[in-house]
Amino acid sequence: MASLGVNIDHIANVRQARRTVEPDPVPMALMAELGGADGITIHLREDRRHIQDRDLTLLGQTVRTRLNLEMAATTEMVEIALREQPDMVTLVPERREEVTTEGGLDVRSQCKSLSSVIDTLQSNDIPVSLFVDPDRNQLEACQQSGARWVELHTGRYAEASWREQPITLARLIEATEQARSMGLRVNAGHGLTYQNVEPIAAIAGMEELNIGHTIVARALCVGLQEAVREMKCLVQNPRRDPLFGSTSS
């Protein structure tokens, strides 16, 4: 049964749109936990477009589940992670011109530098996950890098047409099996919604789904606790066959 990590970046986006103090993502993280979140995910970007350093510090002091810090593999971010000691770091690619993370890390071409970052963090008791596309070559590079986890990028699945979705889903199923056979633990995320999450949650060996935008959007209608509760129900009780996405009897 997969667990649910709630990404609260989009709450900070609303705050930063007016450069003000509200909504504050710190108490909102508590509301997400009260709704059933198994963890809180934030992305501290180099340009600080949404989550700020004070958010990370305060969340580290207040989150009662676990705090997953998404970040680029830069010297500055490594220093921040070592200081703040999140429960996990997920290394992600980052480009200033992108609206959101657009693809997985190219671990193959950066394996040496990433290995150094991973070793530094894990030797300080911070487990590291790598955000990657569901590609065997990338998974092999993840294994070589020393990372213990991968987070599979579900963007292509989320954006696929109904004809293409079974193909992209099959790739994620295969990648999960491959990663686990290499000794890697598997999370997934990006673009998942209330409408498409169940087949991903039903994949054998999937440990956690990190979901943000759709939960925050739903919260505008029903409140954050209820929005998280609804998603948690789908993640923990998926009703769809993970190969074909059809409703089971």
Swiss-Prot record:
A Gene Ontology biological process in which this protein takes part is:
pyridoxine biosynthetic process
Give the first-level EC class, as a single word.
transferase
Q: Which residues bind 1-deoxy-D-xylulose 5-phosphate?
A: D9, H10, R45, H50, T100
Task: State any GO CC term.
Answer: cytosol
Q: Where in the cell is it found?
A: Cytoplasm
Residue numbers for the site described as Transition state stabilizer? E151
What role is this protein assigned?
A: Catalyzes the complicated ring closure reaction between the two acyclic compounds 1-deoxy-D-xylulose-5-phosphate (DXP) and 3-amino-2-oxopropyl phosphate (1-amino-acetone-3-phosphate or AAP) to form pyridoxine 5'-phosphate (PNP) and inorganic phosphate.
What is the name of this protein? Pyridoxine 5'-phosphate synthase
